[in-house]
Amino acid sequence: MALAGLPPAAPLPCWTEVCPLSAREPATDPSGPPLDAYRHNLPRPMSPLIGRSGELAAIGACLDANRLVTLTGAGGVGKTRLAVEAATERTSRDAIRCFWVELATLRNPDAVASAVASALGVRETASEAAVTAIARFVGDRPVLLVLDNCEHVVAPCADMAGRLLARCANLTVLATSREPLGVPGK
């Protein structure tokens, strides 16, 4: 403290805001505390969201009433940004964990579940499929899973989301896509 020019009893400014996400370790035991070690891995916007409060409120209402919500629209209309804001609001309001999965660069449709497992820090094994490992990791804990840019992997996203929702009672999925996922009951 003296080297920083601060008196010995001075509080350290804002250090805790930087550490939680950078200190996150990948989960090795899907049943354990790593899920509770942090609240989210959401991207941080560079600027505030302006003029979209109506859409944001509607998304919040949809998330309150449904376990799977897909934000659809043409490219560039702000689906991703709205998803970030809606997920941020939800993690701030509720005691849930949120996992962001960016799918835009995914080239292999068969790798969707593996990409989600990786984002959650879940390690697949030869004897356990990715969806099974993810479901075991999430369990009955309240989790919001955000799948961004699903349009080029709609079918595998829909399949995985349906299977996870059937296994995880407190899981909610928010997806962004140029077309609906088409999961029954959505």
Q: Where do the model's predicted regions map?
A:
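An N-terminal, helix-rich hydrophobic module
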Residues: M1-D29
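Short, conserved phosphate/pyrophosphate- and ester-handling motifs at nucleotide-, phospho-/glycolipid
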Residues: P11, R52, K79-T80
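Conserved adenine-nucleotide phosphate-binding loops and their immediately adjacent elements
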Residues: C19-A61
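AAA+/P-loop NTPase substrate/partner-engagement loops
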Residues: A95-I96, W100-A115
